[in-house]
A protein has these predicted regions:
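Repeated loop/turn-to-beta-strand initiation elements of outer-membrane beta-barrel proteins
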Residues: 26, 63-69, 95-101, 137-142, ...
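Cleavable N-terminal export/targeting peptides
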Residues: 1-25
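Short glycine/proline- and aromatic-enriched beta-strand/turn motifs that initiate or cap beta-hairpins
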Residues: 22-75
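Transmembrane beta-barrel strands of outer-membrane/channel proteins
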Residues: 30-34, 69-73, 101-105, 133, ...
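Detector for outer-membrane/organellar transmembrane beta-barrel domains
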Residues: 117-188, 213
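Residue-level signature of outer-membrane beta-barrel architecture
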Residues: 59-61, 89-91, 105, 133-135, ...
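Residues that define the transmembrane beta-barrel architecture of outer-membrane proteins
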Residues: 24, 47-53, 79-83, 123-129, ...
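Outer-membrane beta-barrel "beta-signal"
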Residues: 136, 198-208, 213, 229-243
Length: 243
């Protein structure tokens, strides 16, 4: 069974389990997208219009604690599926201010967790701690990993985003992220880069239709894992369904 079918069947089976649970504690989602961009960089070789099927499940009891999992196909040397696990706590300070913090694990269960970079076998899997605060449509957050993707050492991700409804079923959003590495392993002579995204989402026909423009300031093969196409600006279209 190919990787798209495997992920799809798994999501459908888990979706059946979700339907049998209490609606206020367990939920799910599935997305079909033209690309999988993570912090501005495509996780699918060649970048651009490379289809991704993604989905996840969240357990959120009334206490504010939560657990979840999320998966997507990827396409690079050393992995074709990403499976993530996360957990944390979120709550409100008042009617307009809320916060969230937790732990996120990024796993690549296939192909021995190895990424072949210049004939070196490097561990793909890593984890992050994260925290954010939200108020009046603005979110400010930071993620930190002591040993980031492919053993690149200390890494921090600082970001700001804003979203608002401009009509009953239309939401627009903007995001800016600053990626800071401890080592200059994959980014040429630099140890940081920026990514940004603007998007518009419309709810209709039981799904959410989203069009986003995603970009980074990485503009050469040397700065972007040997393939600048992975980091070039692109439009990403997706269809999402809540389960």
């Amino acid at each position: 069974m190919n990787k798209f079918a495997s992920i799809g069947v798994g999501l459908l089976l888990l979706g059946s389990a979700v339907a049998a649970q209490a609606a206020d504690t367990l939920s799910g989602n599935v997305t079909l997208a033209t690309d999988y961009r993570f912090r501005g960089i495509s996780q699918l070789e060649g970048g651009g219009w490379s289809p991704a099927i993604q989905g996840g499940f969240d357990w959120k009891p009334a206490s504010g604690f939560y657990l979840g999992t999320w998966a997507s196909n990827v396409n690079f040397s050393g992995g074709d599926i990403e499976v993530d696990l996360y957990g944390g706590y979120g709550n409100k300070i008042n009617d307009t201010v809320s916060y969230d913090f937790g732990f996120y694990y990024y796993g690549y269960p296939n192909d021995g967790h190895n990424f072949n970079q210049n004939e070196n076998k490097l561990n793909l899997a890593y984890y992050e701690y994260y925290g954010d605060i939200s108020f009046m449509g603005v979110k400010l957050g930071v993620n930190y990993s002591p040993d980031y993707f492919a053993e690149t050492g200390d890494f921090s991700y600082w970001y700001a985003e804003y979203s608002t409804k401009i009509a009953d079923k239309v939401t627009v959003a903007a995001h800016y992220g600053y990626n800071k590495f401890d080592q200059k392993r994959f980014l040429g002579n630099r140890d940081y880069y920026s990514d940004w995204k603007v998007s518009a989402a419309i709810d209709g026909l039981g799904v959410t239709w989203t069009l986003a423009y995603v970009a980074t300031n990485l503009d050469s093969d040397q700065e972007c894992f040997g393939d600048k196409d992975l980091c070039e600006a692109t439009a990403v279209f997706s269809i999402s369904k809540a389960l």
